[in-house]
Design a protein with these regions (language model features):
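Extracellular/virion structural assembly segments
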Residues: 3, 64-140, 149-154, 165-167
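Solvent-exposed edge beta-strands and adjacent loop segments
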Residues: 10-89, 137-152
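N-terminal export/ancillary region detector
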Residues: 1-10
Length: 167
């Protein structure tokens, strides 16, 4: 059985794009079901409708140039498998008891993470927002609270979230 579903090539895009993350949004994983989002016909992988009526979204503003969102693809030729490992490394400046309490709650909760990038969709001009953990959720599995040493050092948190997705 041949698996030749490749449909097109890709040229070079314009060279005026920006990296980085502007905002991180969290939603509790259990608060909305698979039926709450939809793809338009022919746009698998690009969600155009999400019903957040039963879910609250929490927005975190992150310092410029500090937060990353990425996915690592892992495949096995021997097993015929491919899966994705989404990871978000998020920085929050300043140690506070309020943040410490929220971080504790984030660590106890499986979440979906939406990362608003410093990029815009070339056809529409809309901000690019990617979702990580859409099907299986994300968990905070590491982090640090760092006071810094010198006056100019960062005082704050680094939080690491990861997940595992089949697509």
């Amino acid at each position: 059985m041949a698996c030749t579903a490749l449909t097109k090539g890709r040229g070079l895009d314009c060279n005026r794009i920006s990296g980085g993350v502007k905002f991180i949004y969290f939603s509790v994983y259990d608060d909305f079901a698979r039926t709450d989002w939809a793809y338009s016909s022919g746009t698998e992988g690009e969600i155009d409708t999400i019903n957040f009526q039963t879910s609250t979204i929490y927005r975190y503003t992150v310092p410029r140039g500090s937060t990353t969102a990425n996915e690592t693809l892992t495949g096995s030729t021997e097993n015929g498998t491919l899966f994705y490992n989404p990871v978000v490394n998020m920085v929050l400046n300043r140690l506070t008891k309020e943040d410490q309490n929220q971080i504790k709650l984030l660590g106890q909760t499986q979440v979906r993470i939406f990362a608003q990038l410093n990029a815009t969709h070339s056809a529409t001009g809309n901000d690019v927002i990617i979702c990580l953990g859409m099907h299986n959720g994300m968990s905070m599995n590491a982090g640090t609270a760092d006071s810094g040493a010198a006056f100019g050092d960062r005082n704050g948190y680094t939080l690491n979230f990861d997940g595992l997705e089949a697509q």
